[in-house]
Amino acid sequence: HTLGFAHNFAASTNGRASVMDYPHPKLDVVAGAISYENAYAVGMGAWDKTSVRYSYSQFPEGTDETKELNSILEESILKGNRFISDQDARPIGGAHPHAHLWDNGASAIEEYNHLLKVRSIALKNFSDDQLRVGEPYSVLNDRLVPMYFLHRYQAEAIVKLIGGVDYSYGVKGPIPFEITTVAAETQKDALTAMVNSLSSEVLAIPKPLLKQLPPTAFGYSATRESFRSQTGRVFDVLGAPASLGKGIMQMILNPERVSRLIQQKALDANQLSFDQLANELTKSIFKKQYRDSYHQAIQAQLKESYLNVLFGLHANNNTTASVKAISFGVIKRIENGLKKNTLEPHRAYYINKIKRFLENPEAYEVQKTPVLPDGSPIGTDTFCNQFTF
């Protein structure tokens, strides 16, 4: 910023092209173990060098400066560098498939699946080895947070493929300009990856680890970056999966995102539709069955959160009539399915919950559930181009 450079949140699609892209640590899996060897890069990236050349190059007298500056940009574009900044990268409802904070990789889908693998290894290996001698066991609670939510920022990246639109800050010149919708197969693959990450197997904290997560020790306190709890001072075993699951659902069912899906489907019959998206979520959350009681309890939390997110989407005053109509249909299909499913243990509760909501959507108060701990701390109303997040 001191040199006058803005964030380039599309730089990470071309390696580590800019330190102004908040690159996430690169974590590799080698022989079944997590490797930190390439976690951080050293020095400037390709886009940073382009920024310096464009801003501070001095040309001999008589040089066509405009031509030389344009050639710097054209050369950078041909090398695969892109520039997309704050206003297109920060909003959860953003559409740009390449502009994200704290992400890695040319493929958001591949990196999301990779981070889930890294996370699985980290959770299996997480133990009191993460403590110094003399530290309270309760410190593990906070040290678990970044491991459990390891993929939260990559989730913000992959979800922008759904209803995604690729564009640039193009100007008229020799470089072709075109706005394109993210391919239907890519959108469907992104949805599949996100739905898979909502399974109870992925959301469950390993049972052996739960035995090492006591209430906060005397002299210590929970912070805004700690797990939230609805079980008093005792670690909320179901609260962590509930908050993560709800957070991912809110990303997927963002009002702006589903509005774009409806428009994209209208222009291209092969595109992913809002109906298809909702059907995949419903199938995963309401139709998947578990024998394990721990997984059943997590699934019940997901059902509650899914209904609440759908209710919020339908009642949102800023959504279009099409969003309201389709979300209404989704809710009714869930209700009808519940009426037929006599094996659902909370059947009467869910049916009554839906009935009360549909009677008066605007007046319905959604039940509170634990929210995600605060994550990215960077940015205020004053800095980063006046965008809040």
List each language-model region with its residue ranges.
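Short, flexible loop/turn elements at secondary-structure junctions
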Residues: H7-F9, H24
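Conserved catalytic/binding loops enriched for acidic/polar residues
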Residues: N14-F389
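Active-site recognition of the HExxH zinc-binding catalytic motif
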Residues: H1-H7
